[in-house]
Amino acid sequence: MSLIKLFISISFLLFSSNLYSKEDVINLQLKDGIVKIKTFEDKAPKHVKQITDLVTKGSYDGVVFHRVIDGFMAQTGDVQFGNSNSDTYDLRRAGTGGSGNNIEAEFNDMPHKRGTLSMARAQDPNSADSQFFICFGDTPHLDGQYTVWGEVIEGMEVVDAIKKGDPVKNGLVDDPDKIIKMWIE
């Protein structure tokens, strides 16, 4: 009987705790608050490592949301030309740079839905680097074409408040919002 109680107690502890560890959570501080992001290391290990390495180095702090399309997505992560704290900052070139370390695609079965974080890339499927986007809504036409590496678990209203770009300019943003700070919990 005590073995059954022990099993029940352990089961309760496992299921009542968070389903992710703190190491799997990235905090994204924006002007309107903090966004918590759960990473999918099991689905996109190389991409999660690249992102977390850049976060740990502070590479994303000050990086602008250079392309934001209402109802679709907010794109950021150009650590080369999009970092407003850097001497290389150039809003006209934001979206064309990265860290210089392209990653092989890790397309997976995670859907592009509201709150999904996925890697931006060029035409080459293996050209993802540091840029990523957050989906404002469901975007199934991206499934299997971009690497999903995380999802917003708290603070989606903060993401919704990111300054939107001009639709005529494909979402390019004048005087864009930026990442104030990113850190791993």
Q: Where do the PLM segments sit?
A:
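N-terminal secretory signal peptides that target proteins for export/translocation
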Residues: 1-2
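Bacterial N-terminal signal peptides
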Residues: 5-15
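Cyclophilin-like peptidyl-prolyl cis-trans isomerases
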Residues: 18-185
